[in-house]
Structures are given as structure tokens and as C-alpha cells.
Amino acid sequence: MSVSLYDYYGQTRTATDPFNLDHWRDDCKPHLPWADNHFLERVSGAPLNPGATYQDWRHGASAHSFTDENGQFNHTYMERMWPKWADKLGVLQTTDDYERQMLIVDPLRVNRGIRGEYGDLHDLVKLLVREPHTRQAYLPLYFPEDTGASGRKPCTLGYQFILRNQRLHCYYPMRSCDYANHFRDDCYLAVRLLLWVINQCRIADPLGPWNDVMPGSLTIHCTSFHLFANDFIALCQEESNLWTTS
């Protein structure tokens, strides 16, 4: 049983020091230190599966039930952000595993789409550096193979970045999000990705316009923004306790 929420979240946060992560930790209230450690896995450049930080997630014990006979998930954020070598290097828990496998992999075996090679998060940064005002800086996480397939599907459809008036904005569409268990982490990880992209553009083009670019808006669209009944009851009890003790 689930309880649907029909609330519209049209809030905008403006930080005087937007690159100060403590501000965003206080604002988003993610589950730490897991969220920070998992973010580093996501931007490591390696298509890790299963990775390591899932074991430290607060529901990590049940996550094992979603792995296959090799101990891998049917997808990870790391695979989707860095898909060029995904599923060609065996079980990858750490970047050390990835680096060892890359020493022996055939460079011609990179994953391809219908017409060309897969792009990744690094290619998105290169596109922004090359064409700062592009409308094409989109990183898909929901792949064609997910349509019609059984099993788990990515909740995140992708991330789009667009630069306007010296502010880099992020549009974050989701097919589904659990308010109680995932929303805070999803918001925080999206903000961290936005800050990371700006920083990577500055590194790639130190004399370009990116030193003057600041974070803009984070726009999240979620088709199914839901809350399960047991979580709804727990949140109501928590709210009641706050009123009682205040």
C-alpha cells in the first residue's frame, strides 16, 4: 500500500557560498557519510559494479538480494555515467579493479550505440568546454535496454546542464522517487554533480569563461513522487513528537 503525495515543491535555494558543501549538507540533509562516499564512486571515471559504498547504505543489507550470481546489480549509477567499458571488465568494486582491467582490455571493444561510441560524463564536460552555451549537455541514465526489460530500472532518467548568464543550471528528470528514503540524497547528489561539472570545466579550460560561472538552479521533475504507508505513519509520529516536545 502506498500513499500518494500531491504537493508541489517550487522552492529555490540561494547560497551566499554555493561551493561550501557544509551549506548543502545542512540544506539537503543527506545520509552522511554515505552520500559523500557514494558521490566519489559516481564521479570516479570507472563503471563500478557493484562498487563498495552500497554496503554502507542504510538499506545495504537488503541490497544483496538484488545482485546476480556474480554479485553484480543489473545497473549502477557508475555504469551509466561511465558506460564505455561497462560490463566488459568483470566485477568492479574499486577504481583499482578498474585500472587493472584496463591494462588488458581491447581498446576496440568500447560499447557502441547504433551509430557511434557511447559518451560519458567526461564527454559532457568536454562538450560544455567546447560549446559553453550548448543545449545538448545531457547525460542519460535510463538506457534503451531498460525499456521492456524485467527487473530494476534507474529512477533517474538523466541530468541536463545548461549555461545561461554565467550560471550553470541542472535539470533533473526522474521517473520515480521515494520521498522518505531517497529524496534527500537525490537532491544532494545532484547538487554535488552540478558543482563537480563546474569545477571540471574550470580545470579543463582554466583561461576560459568558467572561472566566472556560478551554480544556477536545480530543477527536479518527478513523475511518481511517492511515500509508502509505513513511512507516512513514521513521519507523522515524528512530527507529533516535535510538537509535543516544543
What annotation goes with each model-predicted range?
Residues 1-246:
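Terminal, non-catalytic protein-protein interaction segments that mediate quaternary/complex assembly
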